[in-house]
């Protein structure tokens, strides 16, 4: 589940029982991380990208990351996991806690200075996961990130023109709502 709220409840301050009292639109409940990993283990080619949400309290964000990483390690699933974080002040700390790749998500509606290549270099970030509009507004950043050997993902790429841009620029990952179209473009 991706949103900060569900049926008016803030997820970060609600219990799992409260959150799952009403099923999702498809009739399922929101799975636990352990349940999600159990299903993922049935598909060896799958890489699990875990988005550690930024909470209002940085201590809570830290606790969520630690608990998440603990479960991943307990289930011996580290080789199949990458993390996303959107809170730059905790990036270095989290990176020191795991050898798993951690991508910086950027701040969704704020462009500078956090997302500038100089800031990324200063933090030693090697994985980026930015909204497509930021790369498209600054194609020179793509060149710089590539020169700095930074692993790139763009989201959410939904037009053919945008898909062509990211394929031409050899992005490592492209997040889209139209995977069939993207796969067709990849096979050309």
Task: For the regions a language model picked out, list residue spans one by one.
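Metal-dependent phosphodiesterase/phospholipase catalytic core, i.e.
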Residues: 1-101, 130-133, 146-148
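C-terminal active-site rim and adjoining tail of enzyme catalytic domains
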Residues: 104-188
């Amino acid at each position: 589940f991706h949103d900060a709220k569900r049926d008016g409840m803030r997820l970060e301050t609600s219990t799992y029982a409260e959150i799952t009292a009403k099923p999702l639109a498809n009739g399922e409940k929101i799975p636990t991380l352990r349940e999600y990993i159990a299903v993922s283990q049935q598909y060896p080619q799958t890489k699990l990208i875990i988005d550690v949400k930024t909470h209002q309290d940085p201590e809570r964000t830290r606790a969520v990351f630690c608990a998440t990483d603990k479960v991943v390690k307990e289930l011996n699933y580290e080789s199949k996991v990458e993390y996303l974080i959107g809170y730059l002040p905790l990036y270095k700390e989290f990176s020191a806690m795991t050898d798993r790749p951690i991508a910086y998500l950027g701040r969704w509606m704020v462009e500078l200075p956090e997302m500038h290549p100089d800031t990324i270099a200063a933090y030693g970030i090697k994985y980026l996961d930015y909204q497509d509009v930021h790369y498209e507004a600054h194609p020179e950043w793509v060149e710089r990130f590539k020169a700095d050997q930074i692993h790139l993902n763009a989201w959410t790429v939904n037009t053919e023109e945008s898909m062509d841009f990211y394929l031409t620029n050899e992005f490592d990952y492209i997040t889209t709502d139209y995977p069939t179209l993207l796969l067709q473009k990849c096979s050309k």
